[in-house]
Amino acid sequence: MKNWKTSAESILTTGPVVPVIVVKKLEHAVPMAKALVAGGVRVLEVTLRTECAVDAIRAIAKEVPEAIVGAGTVLNPQQLAEVTEAGAQFAISPGLTEPLLKAATEGTIPLIPGISTVSELMLGMDYGLKEFKFFPAEANGGVKALQAIAGPFSQVRFCPTGGISPANYRDYLALKSVLCIGGSWLVPADALEAGDYDRITKLAREAVEGAKL
């Protein structure tokens, strides 16, 4: 972690909403990122769920410098190295393994690993991490479960993801332990396919404004 160019905390506090993005066509990446930034959302999680995901990260990092682009669904050290080379400024994983944690502590970008149990949280803390993704948030008991897990660990902060929606994201943001939330509703697949970037900007702006209430 001593080689990290920035901290996980500084990235997550830039939130409060981090879009969880699936880019199916490379040509969508840059205009989508610009649309989100125009709506006030700068931290973008591009998931490694499609063949063009790494190239999308590379394009956004190069052409939309005002965005803080990271990689989601990072599963192993090889993927961590690949997204780092592509220009990702952070990495998010759905869970944690010791090889991935070791690679992250020796790497140059922050890893925000997913946890759903206290034991997983403590393993991550053993590697010096303090920021985690709580995933899948709603399926694991939602706000009440996160409150209970966070209780003994006052120094730890979270980005809950999974089942987060406009109807419940403010409930998570109200928790002291939560720095931001991750949500897929900001970049609907049909809006991307139609090239409706104004809709993406509108959704981003509504999410940012709603977080202030």
Swiss-Prot record:
Cellular-component GO terms for this entry: cytosol; membrane
Induction section of the entry: Part of the edd-eda operon, whose expression is controlled by three functional promoters (P1, P2 and P4), each of which is responsible for induction under different growth conditions. Both P2 and P4 are responsible for the high basal level of expression. P1 controls induction on gluconate and is regulated by GntR. P2 is induced by growth on glucuronate, galacturonate and methyl-beta-D-glucuronide, and is mediated directly by KdgR. P4 is active under conditions of phosphate starvation and is directly controlled by PhoB.
Active site: E45, K133
UniProt note: phenotype after gene disruption: Cells lacking this gene show no detectable KHG aldolase activity.
Transmembrane segments: none
Function: Involved in the degradation of glucose via the Entner-Doudoroff pathway. Catalyzes the reversible, stereospecific retro-aldol cleavage of 2-keto-3-deoxy-6-phosphogluconate (KDPG) to pyruvate and D-glyceraldehyde-3-phosphate. In vitro, can also catalyze the cleavage of 2-keto-4-hydroxy-4-(2'-pyridyl)butyrate (KHPB), 2-keto-3-deoxy-6-phosphogalactonate (KDPGal), and of the substrate analogs 2-keto-3-deoxy-gluconate (KDG) and 2-keto-4-hydroxyoctonate (KHO). Can accept some nucleophiles other than pyruvate, including 2-oxobutanoate, phenylpyruvate and fluorobutanoate.
Quaternary data: Homotrimer.
Protein name, entry field: KHG/KDPG aldolase
Organism this protein belongs to: Escherichia coli (strain K12)
